[in-house]
């Protein structure tokens, strides 16, 4: 199926059929498609088809239809002169008629095998100097023709020069009416019975007349109404937009068709396609569509687009329309095309399907180039070929002429027929006409009468030439180098060659011998696993042979096929057909593997130095076929670019092109290497960017390269996706190797590398120099390429997830994340927000999405992403992103709808969650968070102090129960009291110790004591020593610290300071109490008394105190001990 070109142009107008009596000349057999003869048992047939085989055919049974012919028919055939033109028409109603010279014989076909008394009338046609044909006769009835009695059936016949004879009732062959039509000197070519018992008569030059008879049997005629539909009268310029056109003077009509089901009349002419809706008394033209140039362009593309001189060929191609039939997909037009410059000049028969539409479009047209390609002789010979479509819902089609019937398909639906030419070549035999009867294709053989062609159940699933090639590869060339006509016996093939043996089993399967195929498979690869080690290699090789097959039956390849003949040969002259046949063969192979149980037994094969599941490698082959078909279609649109790239690819691979082949022939043969074109296309693009500074010149190359690579990769991905079930892994299979699709291959020439290179080329060399319109297209194309690259990573990661390879998965995921960011960030920087968003959303690049929303200040889009990607924790990612970027204000100012999500996130981030709690006025929760954080803070003094203060404030603002409230506040106050000891450290001391009040660490009670009583605290007074003593209460018994020793150390430090500063200067005769009155020690005692501390229990024993190291030097001074004991005793008595 081919998409048509949309570019209009001037078409070559075809000459009409000439009307003189013509002798029938034999059509030479086609070059390539001789039918194979094989004695294959035919299936059972309905009673209307006799079991007698008329001609031999490989895929079809050709058998007599119905009972024997009426005597008058056989008599007319026997008595016919050599110059008499004989033609037959068969209608679905069961009626048939034969024109033999100037005799018209009408009969009802009996569909039973037993001859019964049937209706048969012999009518005399008006004399004419021109030869009659069955197309100039039609029958009508007021009721259904298949049930109508003979009395109600009327017959109308028109001579080529316009003399009309009308029989009102077939029961009275001698009663008729005649009139003469004025056709302006032109010959008539078709008669069609339409509604209301009337008839349409057409001429080669476009005269359309409607004839009807009154009650007396008198004929009346008038021209068919032209352009009288609802769009008529609106002006020629406007009406052309809707497909309504005027009729030119030199119109040539090729076919006229009446479709009873829709009551529509169609005319195919040199002006295009016209359509009328017909009722009992009038007709309305509803369509006149210029199809000729579109059809010609589409056919030309389909056949010659790979030729290097395509533009020259296109100007000289001739297309001739031959016939037209209805189908559910639209009107099917039979056309023949030839190029006089070809050697040899071949006529290509094509089936063009025109889907109907109110406003027709070229997109509704498809072309199927059949494999019936005889040598071109003359237009007159081509016009002898007609078309039969037995079932409107099926693509099955039959072409026929006097020599043969060719089975094929319209290409407009699934299924179809095996293409085969069925020759009626016995002496004196000719095919005189045909039609459809009882839903079967029925043809009139001069020797055998009516025959039906039925597809055999044993017909091979493979394309015909692929079937022959398979036989050749199994058994080697036959005596004359031709393929074997039947599969060889197993003992004819070397037993050790499992590839050949499995090919033979495949061949048997394709010929519907499933039992024989299964038996051979079981013998080659028993289910117990013996011999299965080679299974993956053998299957892979067979499929590779299919996709890389040499078209050995193409005459141009005759001298270029390897001698061993181990491949599958193809015969099509058209590259696209070769690729399509390879795809059909691949699908047959997959069906064979599935039904014989081999598919589930496949394991893995080494590809590109890595193991891959064999079933996925088979899928890869089909993907490359899909990509090759796309590339072939692009070859027609960009011949110069693709041809140059192909030549470069062949040169890189050191592949020679034989003189009788084009580089395209050689390149498209080896489908498995189709991806080698990508690098070569980029080379051409880079060359264009360097050589042509003008964007108008290099822009076309860049866009074309993007389109080609994009469409090829998308075709491969689409096949992989739509056919995934065919290549699925069996249930409970062991873990498979990592899957690296060919569309994600790295390294030199790998698709991933190619796309990365193209990304860099476009953004560096093309985008900066392009205008706005070109930039938009470039970005759209680039995004499609990046989509392919990223989807390859996803496929890889998915395979690793299934295989349980966590370490490799993590490594690849990091690579994927980094690559994704590298590819998308430049587009984001260029402001291509729409395309960036599309990719980032598809591949969940949350970082890019957040950056995009931040750049555009689009908070609503962020909220949408939170909903869209809720199951992937987008909200957590966003909140974390805000934290990492220091955007805590934005984090804490989220809309109310996200408060719950934010609260959940902040549970793991207590340092921020309390702010959110305050924002939502949950003060109790905020207090709890701050209180816990304060208790856990052991590093920074100022932080702990701040947390305690905030915790106190939130506690005061909260509505917690009173007992809890009081307990929490008391604890906070107590902690603040302890912190006050550190906060009131002397400034001079802090500077001495190089401690910054804002960043100093949180000090322990022991550290604080040491600081207060250290020598560096030169200005220490009773308050400092009293704070040190107060800090002793923060030591718990379980800490293992000797509090009494610390107390002695504090007092000893105070005493040593006193001795140094004042006591040492006192006289022994001084009053000890007066001498110590201003000392630090005494002031400490006074403060303890003020605080009602029991000195008796609190003060350390004097003996223990004097043993302190700090007082070691004072032990030898009696006055010191005297002063100490005197003050001890005095203050103990004072407290009593």
From Swiss-Prot:
Region (Disordered): 1-26
Alphabetical keyword list: Centromere, Chromosome, Kinetochore, mRNA transport, Nuclear pore complex, Nucleus, Protein transport, Translocation, Transport
Annotated coiled-coil segments of the chain: none
Keyword RNA-binding part of the UniProt annotation: no
Effect of deleting the gene: Morpholino knockdown of the protein results in anomalies of the head, brain and kidney. Morphant embryos show decreased head sizes, reduced axonal numbers in the forebrain and midbrain, and disorganization in the hindbrain. As for the renal tissues, morphants show underdeveloped glomeruli with hypoplastic capillary vessels, and abnormal podocytes.
A matching Pfam family: Nucleoporin_C
InterPro entries associated with the record: Nucleoporin_Nup133/Nup155_C, Nucleoporin_Nup133/Nup155_N, Nup133-like, WD40/YVTN_repeat-like_dom_sf
Tissue expression as described in the entry: Widely expressed in the embryo and in adult tissues. Higher expression is observed in the brain, testes, ovary, skin, and kidney.
Cellular component terms (Gene Ontology): kinetochore; nuclear pore outer ring
Single Gene Ontology MF annotation: structural constituent of nuclear pore
Name listed for the protein in its UniProt record: Nuclear pore complex protein Nup133
Function summary: Involved in poly(A)+ RNA transport. Involved in nephrogenesis.
Family statement: Belongs to the nucleoporin Nup133 family.
């Amino acid at each position: 199926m081919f998409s048509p070109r949309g570019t209009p142009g001037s078409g070559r107008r075809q000459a009409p059929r000439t009307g003189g009596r013509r002798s029938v000349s034999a059509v030479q057999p086609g070059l390539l498609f001789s039918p194979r003869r094989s004695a294959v048992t035919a299936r059972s047939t309905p009673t209307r088809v006799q079991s007698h085989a008329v001609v031999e055919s490989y895929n079809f049974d050709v058998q007599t239809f119905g009972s024997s012919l009426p005597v008058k028919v056989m008599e007319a055939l026997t008595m016919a002169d050599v110059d008499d033109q004989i033609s037959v028409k068969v209608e679905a109603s069961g009626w048939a008629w034969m024109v033999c010279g100037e005799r018209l014989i009408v009969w009802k076909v009996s569909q039973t095998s037993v001859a019964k008394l049937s209706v048969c009338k012999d009518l005399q046609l008006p004399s004419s100097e021109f030869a009659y044909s069955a197309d100039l006769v039609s029958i009508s009835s007021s009721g259904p023709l298949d049930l109508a009695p003979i009395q109600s059936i009327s017959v109308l016949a028109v001579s080529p020069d316009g003399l009309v004879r009308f029989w009102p009732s077939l029961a009275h062959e001698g009663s008729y009416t005649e009139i003469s039509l004025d056709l302006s000197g032109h010959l008539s070519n078709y008669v069609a019975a339409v509604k209301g018992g009337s008839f349409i008569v057409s001429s080669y030059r476009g005269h359309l007349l409607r004839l009807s008879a009154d009650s007396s049997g008198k004929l009346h005629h008038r021209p068919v109404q032209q352009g009288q539909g609802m769009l008529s009268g609106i002006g020629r310029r406007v009406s052309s937009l809707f497909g309504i056109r005027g009729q030119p003077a030199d119109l040539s009509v090729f076919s006229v068709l009446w479709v009873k089901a829709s009551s529509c009349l169609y005319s195919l002419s040199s002006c295009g396609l016209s359509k009328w809706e017909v009722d009992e008394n009038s007709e309305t033209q509803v369509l006149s569509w210029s199809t000729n140039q579109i059809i010609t362009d589409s056919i030309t593309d389909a056949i010659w687009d790979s030729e290097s001189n395509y533009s020259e060929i296109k100007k000289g191609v001739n297309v001739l329309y031959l016939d037209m039939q209805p189908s559910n997909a639209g009107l099917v037009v039979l056309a023949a095309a030839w190029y006089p410059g070809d050697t040899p000049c071949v006529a290509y028969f094509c089936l063009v399907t025109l889907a109907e539409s109110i406003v027709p479009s070229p997109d509704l047209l498809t072309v199927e180039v059949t494999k019936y390609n005889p040598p071109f002789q003359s237009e007159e010979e081509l016009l002898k070929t007609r078309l039969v479509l037995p079932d409107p819902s099926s693509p099955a089609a039959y072409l026929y002429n006097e020599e043969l019937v060719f089975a094929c398909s319209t290409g407009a639906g699934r299924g179809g027929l095996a293409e085969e030419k069925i020759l009626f070549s016995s002496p004196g035999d000719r095919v005189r006409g045909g039609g459809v009867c009882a839903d079967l294709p029925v043809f009139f053989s001069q020797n055998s009468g009516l025959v039906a062609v039925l597809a055999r159940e044993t017909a091979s699933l493979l394309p015909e030439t692929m079937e022959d090639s398979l036989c050749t590869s199994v058994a080697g060339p036959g005596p004359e180098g031709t393929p074997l006509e039947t599969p060889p016996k197993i003992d004819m093939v070397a037993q050790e060659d499992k590839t050949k043996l499995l090919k033979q089993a495949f061949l048997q399967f394709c010929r519907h011998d499933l039992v024989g195929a299964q038996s051979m498979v079981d013998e080659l690869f028993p289910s117990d696993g013996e011999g299965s080690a080679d299974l993956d290699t053998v299957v892979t090789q067979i499929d590779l042979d299919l996709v890389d097959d040499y078209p050995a039956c193409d005459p141009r390849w005759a001298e270029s096929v390897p001698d061993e003949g181990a491949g599958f040969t193809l015969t099509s002259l058209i590259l696209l057909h070769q690729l399509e046949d390879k795809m059909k063969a691949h699908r047959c192979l997959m069906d064979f593997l599935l039904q014989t149980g081999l598919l589930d037994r496949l394991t893995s094969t080494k590809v590109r130095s890595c193991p891959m599941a064999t079933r996925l490698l088979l899928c890869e082959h089909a993907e490359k076929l899909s990509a090759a078909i796309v590339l072939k279609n692009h070859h027609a649109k960009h011949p110069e670019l693709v041809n140059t790239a192909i030549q470069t690819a062949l040169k890189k691979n050191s592949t020679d092109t034989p003189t009788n082949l084009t580089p395209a022939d050689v390149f498209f043969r080896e489908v498995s290497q189709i991806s080698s074109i990508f690098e070569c296309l980029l080379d051409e693009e880079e060359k264009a960017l360097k050589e042509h500074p003008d964007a108008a010149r290099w822009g076309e190359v860049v866009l074309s390269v993007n389109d080609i690579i994009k469409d090829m990769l998308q075709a491969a991905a689409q096949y992989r996706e739509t056919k995934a079930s065919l290549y699925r892994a069996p249930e409970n299979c062991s873990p498979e190797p990592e899957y690296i699709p060919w569309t994600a291959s790295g390294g030199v020439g790998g698709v991933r590398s190619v796309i990365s290179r193209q990304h860099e080329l476009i953004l560096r060399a093309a985008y900066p120099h392009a205008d706005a319109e070109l930039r938009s297209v470039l970005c759209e194309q680039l995004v499609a390429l990046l989509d392919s690259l990223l989807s390859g990573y996803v496929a890889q990661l998915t395979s690793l997830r299934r295989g349980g390879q966590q370490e490799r998965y993590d490594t690849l995921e990091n690579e994927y994340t980094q690559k994704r960011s590298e590819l998308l960030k430049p587009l984001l920087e260029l402001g291509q927000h729409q395309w960036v968003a599309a990719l980032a959303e598809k591949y969940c690049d949350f970082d890019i999405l957040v950056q995009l929303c931040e750049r555009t200040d689009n908070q609503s889009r962020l909220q949408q992403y939170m909903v869209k990607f809720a199951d992937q924790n987008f909200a957590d990612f966003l909140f974390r992103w805000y934290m990492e970027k220091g955007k805590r204000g934005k984090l804490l100012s989220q809309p109310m709808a996200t408060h719950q999500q934010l609260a959940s996130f902040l549970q793991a981030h207590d340092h921020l969650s309390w702010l959110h709690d305050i924002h939502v006025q949950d003060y109790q929760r905020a207090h709890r968070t701050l209180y816990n954080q304060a208790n856990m803070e052991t590093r920074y003094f100022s932080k702990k102090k701040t947390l305690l203060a905030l915790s106190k404030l939130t506690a005061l603002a909260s509505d917690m129960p009173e007992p809890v409230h009081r307990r929490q506040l008391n604890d906070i106050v107590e902690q603040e009291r302890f912190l006050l000891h550190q906060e009131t450290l002397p400034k001079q001391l802090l500077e001495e110790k190089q401690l910054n009040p804002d960043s100093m660490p949180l000090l322990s009670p022991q550290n604080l004591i040491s600081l207060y009583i250290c020598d560096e605290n030169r200005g220490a007074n009773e308050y400092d020593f009293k704070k040190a003593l107060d800090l002793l209460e923060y030591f718990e018994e379980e800490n293992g610290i000797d509090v009494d020793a610390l107390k002695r150390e504090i007092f000893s430090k105070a005493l040593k300071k006193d001795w140094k500063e004042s006591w040492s200067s006192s006289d022994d005769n001084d009053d000890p109490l007066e001498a110590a009155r201003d000392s630090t020690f005494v002031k400490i005692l006074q403060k303890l008394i003020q605080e009602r501390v029991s000195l008796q229990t609190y003060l350390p024993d004097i003996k223990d105190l004097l043993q302190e190291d700090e007082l070691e030097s004072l032990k030898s001074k009696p006055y010191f001990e005297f002063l100490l004991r005197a003050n001890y005793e005095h203050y103990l008595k004072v407290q009593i």
